[in-house]
Structure formats: C-alpha cells, structure tokens
A protein has these predicted regions:
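Active-site environment of non-heme Fe oxygenases that use a 2-His-1-carboxylate facial triad
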Residues: 1-160
Length: 160
C-alpha cells in the first residue's frame, strides 16, 4: 500500500498521474498483444541499483492474480527484447491515466501492486508525505485475471 499526502503543492506542475494496471494490461492485450506477452515474461526487467531485481512488468500467478511492477527512471533496465515494445506500454498507460492536482490536506491511498503512479515535473517547493506499508487485512496482490473481456497473457504465453 502507498499513501501520499500533500502539505504544500508545487507552484506549477506536480500533478499526480495514476493508471490502473488492470486497464493498462487490458489495453495492451487488445492493442499490442505481443507487448503484453513479452512484458509478462520472467526476467525481462531489472529494477533497482547494482545487479537490480530481476522481474517483469506483469506477473501472472497460478491463482489468476496479476500484480504490476514498473519503473520508468534510471533504475529500470530492460532485456534487449523489451525496448521496441515500450512505446506501446507508454501509450496504454497514457490512455488509462488519471491526472489531478493535490491541494493541501488532500492525498490518496492505493495498492502498489495494482496501480501505476507518477507525477509531472514541477517548480517550487512541493511538500508531500509518503508512506509505504502492508494492509492489516490480507489482500491478494494485483488484480484478477478474470477481470478481462479479452484473454490476458497466460504463464504459457509468457514462456514462449
């Protein structure tokens, strides 16, 4: 879980950008199926410094749950197969994105395994409080595979 709370907004910019990972994957399955399959393939992404954390953008679990994990900064590195598909991923994210400005006293709480989050560039002295945590009541990670009208990638697809 992630909480972000605004104490002081930026003079300009700093809007919140949120995209539901389920909607992003559904868009990819429909518009760029090859990208959806590749982005669910194990070890196609490395997140973090040093050797990184080998991962993938969409992890398809046996129970049908699909958590999402994505960085688009200097701490993200990709398998050589992935870069040609990043424009399709970015289009899918942009097509699903919610954009809003937080005023003092406003914030949001989201499931970090389901929602993609970012912010726009800003000027001024923006001040937000951020906290990461685990829910008291167990929550399954990500979203359910059966939430799709189009067939999402399966583990079998991701290993091709």
């Amino acid at each position: 879980m992630r909480v972000l709370f605004c104490l002081r907004p930026a003079a300009e910019g700093g809007e919140v950008l949120l995209a539901d990972g389920r909607d992003v994957l559904a868009s990819l399955v429909t518009e760029a199926r090859e990208a959806a399959i590749l982005l669910a393939k194990a070890r196609t992404a490395y997140f973090g410094a040093g050797a990184g954390y080998p991962s993938q953008v969409f992890t398809v679990h046996v129970d049908g749950r699909i958590p999402v994990r994505l960085r688009q900064d200097g701490l993200a590195r990709w398998s050589p197969l992935v870069p040609p598909h990043l424009p399709a991923l970015r289009r899918a994210i942009a097509g699903c994105q919610l954009r809003f400005r937080l005023e003092p006293g406003q914030g949001y709480l989201l499931d970090n395994h389901r929602w993609l989050h970012a912010r726009t560039r800003f000027t001024g002295h923006r001040l937000c409080l951020r906290a990461l945590g685990e829910p008291r009541v167990p929550m399954p990670p990500g979203f359910a595979r059966d939430a799709f009208s189009a067939r999402p990638p399966t583990t079998r697809d991701a290993t091709c």
